Amino acid sequence: RNMTAVRCGKEIVIFDMGLRLDQLMIHEDAEVDEMHSLDLIKIKAIPDDTVLQKVEGTVKAIVCSHGHLDHIGAIPKLAHRYKAPIIATPYATELIRQQISGEKKFGVNNRLFALSAGQRYTLSPNLVLEFVHTQHSIIDTVTPVLHTPHGAIVYACDFKFDRTPVIGKPPDFARFRQIGKEGVLALIVESTYIHRPGRCPSERIARDLVRDVITSFEDDKSAIVVSTFSSHISRVKTIAECAHEIGRKPVFLGRSMQKYSVTAEQMKFV
């Protein structure tokens, strides 16, 4: 349930509004689309943004770094409280649009604005938002950078320094270095398993491992069942390609698998 508010003077920028899925799993009868935000806050499924009532300032934007539910899942429940646009990458924006369309409790009329990696958006005379391209286990992920008169605030929440990705380009290391030289006021950083020493191998290595396993069943006549995160389009792409290599027809099952894959295909990511 990621959500971070940054205040500069009397202007506030909110980064992410996430949904904590494991808390919902505890409450099996929870129908998120029909639940009130206060009830979701009570079970710690979404951020408790009531703390912002004590913070003086105007929210200028709600910025999302990527389309995972733990970063956008609370938007249908909380965004309507703020007279501010929702800014995200094109793929994340479309996922947010779908989230909002399924909401049954609140009406969300915030303007949705798609900002691509490498672009900037002026929020006010003192605040400029920049999206820097990075990699993650979901396509079209960026590191938002908020440029202020006091220096840059880098919101690096979920990223992977993958130099050989399966989809898209490597992270924009040149721009990251340049921002560092220009001066960073604050780095807000988080990444899954960051407490473990070492590094995460490239997705290209994962692709080779998946191919090795799937192609080993080339002469088998039985059905092959493969599970993966539905939002991991690079992995889904690899699985589908490997299926074709051994003369099999890939069949996607599940609403989430359909949502993420169809959206990626329609937007020409695959």
Locations of regions flagged by a protein language model:
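His/Asp/Glu-rich metal-coordinating catalytic cores
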Residues: R1-A61, H68-V270
